[in-house]
Each structure stands twice: as structure tokens, then as C-alpha cells.
């Protein structure tokens, strides 16, 4: 029996394989080749190849899981008799999927950790939860099918799955924009002094956050409900700019009235949210500047004027909104160009898809870098991994 070896990059997060066995005619073996790398061997069989590995639950990291998913996708490609078009490790789509899922799932784990520990969440955390879920939805619905295309799986035959993924991508993208806008507007309300015209709204704003998040999801689910109606579950790499957002589904919008109404609603929402975010960011900077001028005579000799929790939270929101504005401005310009010129090349379509997924990929790391509590949780996880790595080397 011949075997094909697929090396896995477990150098940073080595795992201890506790068991591996055969399932009937599908031989699967796993072994540790050295202290820094684990390799999996798939039996050369016909049909679908199955990966079965048992790993201690307490020692399984996110990165290890993603590596196993990559191997499983690679085995699916081998079952179809196709090969990837380029090395997987150099593919920007796969890199974006790994980094984006790792960041967003880590942030979701952080919020779940606080919830089950009984900590009272901050008002902004409620918005960030929905933002993280929406970003994860964008990455899972758009980038993973494109990663499957990189592996050679170019036929998306599930009609319902095509509709669902296309619909989920549009809803996730809209909620991501709306949540970022809501976050910036809420922040500008909370940092204004109590004696300003925002005083009454400042008291009531936290009570409306939950309702605002629900309305945001409901609005985008209703607006995008017309989108799957015109979707066909066929893979099309040709003339993608006329058919839709995703390479694995085509969406010919033959009804010009429906197309115009949908385009008007989505464009109005995006422009409105972007305008509100720019206004909120400018207002935050102006309020901070005035506050700095007022207290400058009090803390003239302070060497760390930006080290307070309030300033760190505001800087985190500003960094997030700036990242959003940059990514979506570039993607908007790219998609306008694609809409105006029908003969756009395929690489430009891929570039536009890469840009639109930049914000869901980067945003969790922006939040974790600016918030010391999130960074502290990540450092605890890193210390546990280093302790396990030390024990692993003694084996």
C-alpha cells in the first residue's frame, strides 16, 4: 500500500497525537516525525479519503484545527484527481482564511469566556460581538469556497448551498458595515460631556444597543432576501463581473427594476454608514483635542497621557473605523471599476475579493492589540502553549 505524505506546519503549536487507526479500506496513519513537525499519511484509495485523528481536547489549538482542515481539503482534491494550481502556503486566499478565522474565533472565545465567568460586558462589547459574528460569516461564506477553488474543487453543485452562502455573505457584509457604524456613533455619544446637548441621549444610548443590533440583522436579512431568488447554483469563472460577487455562484439579475431597487438600497446604506463613521471619527478627535487642552495645565508633566482605559478604548474604536474606511473605500473603487468595464480581468476580480475580506481579517487583531484585557487572555494562551511545548520536547 502506497502512502502520500502531507507535511503540516505544527512548528508553533505541536500537538500530541493520542490515537490513530484504520477505518475499513481507508488506511489513515499519523506520526510525529520530530519534535517540531507532525505528518499525516493518507492511504492511496479510490473515492473520498477520510482523516481520523484523535487529539487531547485541552491541547488542541485553533491553528492546529485549521491545519487539519487544510489537509482534509487537500485530501478531497486528491479524491477528485485534481491538483492545486499553486502551493497552498503561498496562496493569499488560504492565508486570509487562516488568519481571519483564527482572529475572529479567538475574539469570540474571549467574549464567551467573559460570559461564562459572569463578567458584566461593556456596552461596546455587545456591538463587537455582533461585529465579530458578521466578520466570521463573511470569511466563512466567501473565502472558504474560494479556497476550495484553489485546491481544485471548481464545481459547486449544491443548489441550496450556493444560495445560502451567497445570501450569508451579503448579510454578513451588511451587518459588518452597520455594526461598525453603530460602534462609532455610540462612542461619540458616550465621550461627550454630560452638560452638552448629548446628555439625555448619553443616558439612554446603552439601553438601545441590543435593539439596534437586532434591527441591523433584520434589515439586512430582509433586504438581501431578494438576492438568492436570482441565484443559480453553477460555477462560472467567465464574465464574473456581470453575474455576482462569488466565483462559485452566478446571479443573473434579469429584472432591471429589482436590480435597481436592490442597488439603491445597498448603496444608500453603505454611503450613509460610511458618512456617519467619518463624522463620528472627526467628532471623537475634536472632543479629545478639546479635552486635552482643558486638562493640559493639570497633567503637564504626565509622561503617559494616553494610558487611561478610556483613551485606549477610544483609540481602539478610531483604529477600527480607520481600518474599515480604508478597506471598504478601496473595495468600493474596485467594484465600481468592475461594474463600468465589462472586460475586467479575472485577477482584478480576485483582488477585489481580497480587499473586501481585509477588514473582517484585520479587525479582531486591531481590537486585541488596543485592548490590554484581550491581549492578556492571548498571552495566557501563549504561555500554556509554551508550557505544553516544553513538556512535548521531554517526550
From Swiss-Prot:
The chain crosses the membrane at residues 12-32, 52-72, 94-114, 171-191, 209-229, 268-288, 317-337, 347-367. It is found in: Cell membrane. Its main location: membrane. One of its GO terms (molecular function) is pheromone receptor activity. GO terms for cellular component: plasma membrane. Residues 73-93, 192-208, 289-316, 368-395 are cytoplasmic. Keywords: Cell membrane, G-protein coupled receptor, Glycoprotein, Membrane, Pheromone response, Receptor, Transducer, Transmembrane, Transmembrane helix. The keyword Transmembrane helix applies. Glycans are attached at residues 239, 343. Disulfide bonds: none annotated. GO terms for biological process: response to pheromone; sensory perception of chemical stimulus. Putative pheromone receptor. The chimpanzee, gorilla and orangutan orthologous proteins do not exist, their genes are pseudogenes. This is Vomeronasal type-1 receptor 2. It comes from Homo sapiens (Human). The gene is VN1R2.
